[in-house]
Amino acid sequence: MGQPSIDLPSRLLRNLKPWLGASHWRIAFSGGLDSTVLLHLLAKLAKNQSIPALSAIHVHHGLQAAADAWPAHCQAVCEELAVPLQVQRVQVQPGASVERAARDARYAAFSAATQANDVLLTGQHRDDQAETLLFRLLRGAGVRGLSGMPATRALGQGSLVRPLLDVTRAELEAYARDHGLRWIEDPSNQDRQFSRNYLRHQIMPLLIGRWPQAHASMARSAAHLREAQGLLDELAQIDLTQASLPSEFEWSGLPSLEFAAIAKLSDARQRNALSHWLEPLTRLPDTDHWSGWVDVRDAGNDASPIWRLADGELHRSAGRLWWLSGEWLRTPVVSGDWHDLSSALRLPDNGRVMFSGQTPVGPLHIRYRQGGEVMDLAGRGHRDLKRLLNERAVPGFVRGRLPLLFRGEELLAVANLPGLDGNALEGWRLHWQPSDEDQGLR
């Protein structure tokens, strides 16, 4: 048995206590039972408690004809409760899973609306947590997936909070009946071709019939697994700290790790550390695709192996693991002559270059390595550029992007490489700032 519905306001306020200092609480309001109860609870609390500014957001997917009436319903409910409402229309991208595509579009809208120190509140409850655990178990999820929905996580510039995870659906229904609330029944929630609906309507009733406390037990298991995941995260932090000594190429802005520090770990600790490191950068591979990491790890020292993932690539080069995405995966285009040497020159798909100190005599232009370049070094004569790059252990993926400064056919400088990046006698150096495009998920 859950706690009586009359206790819901105090439980909700207790769960939201850590976020009372937020600038804004925004309710993800679909118009369904869960979010309707959450909205009503918070609107009532706002009358006698000091809580942040309150509003709601309704995301309209337009996936079914019935949904066209939902924004008006949500607007009427919000007006009755004196809560401002934002209706956000989104386009759902076609794909194999309509459920996932709609969720992605919805959370993209939520993320865009969540500003610094804002909190987005969603209405998932304990029954949802149990379904999530079972659904992910059937998909072969690991500890992180089986830990269920977190009570809070980062979203946009603020936070997403699920304050009803300790509340049952039965409690929400009782509260709604007691207060005469009206809510939307989404017809798609009855469509059992969707996996979650099948679990909810076909499987869960059988489990509850045999084990009445199944929802509570599964939610408790998810909590245990969250604790276990926390320990794995702590272990990953220890291992990543050992592998996070700075490289000679910090100016690249690329996330990187010392390869040897990762390779010496057990296979399980390697996967744990890399999963933790890669999670903010890319969608993680499933178990079957971790063979790509084994190929990178076990390649010979003279190789430059690459593991291609959903949102970028993991490279092994110069004794390190490097994460590349965005412009780093596009071939830079030659920019032509550099006319105003006093200003930085923007390079298509490759950041910008600039001088410090004096500026050399022009005309000058930037090229990229093609092979066969030679550089005249004071006291050393003519030296092959490939050998000079080898001496400095420049990663292979950097070599094709390094801006080379030419006067006519004479190679004057290689940006950012000490001893090659300028002329001490003439008092100038060439600096390259690679693109600061986000290295990670958006």
Curated annotation (Swiss-Prot):
GO annotation terms (biological process): tRNA modification
A GO MF label: ATP binding
Top-level enzyme category: ligase
Primary location class: cytoplasm
Keywords: ATP-binding, Cytoplasm, Ligase, Nucleotide-binding, tRNA processing
Any GO CC annotation of this UniProt entry: cytoplasm
Pfam assignment, any one: TilS
NCBIfam families for this protein: lysidine_TilS_C, lysidine_TilS_N
Role summary: Ligates lysine onto the cytidine present at position 34 of the AUA codon-specific tRNA(Ile) that contains the anticodon CAU, in an ATP-dependent manner. Cytidine is converted to lysidine, thus changing the amino acid specificity of the tRNA from methionine to isoleucine.
Domain remark text: The N-terminal region contains the highly conserved SGGXDS motif, predicted to be a P-loop motif involved in ATP binding.
Family listed: Belongs to the tRNA(Ile)-lysidine synthase family.
Descriptive protein name: tRNA(Ile)-lysidine synthase
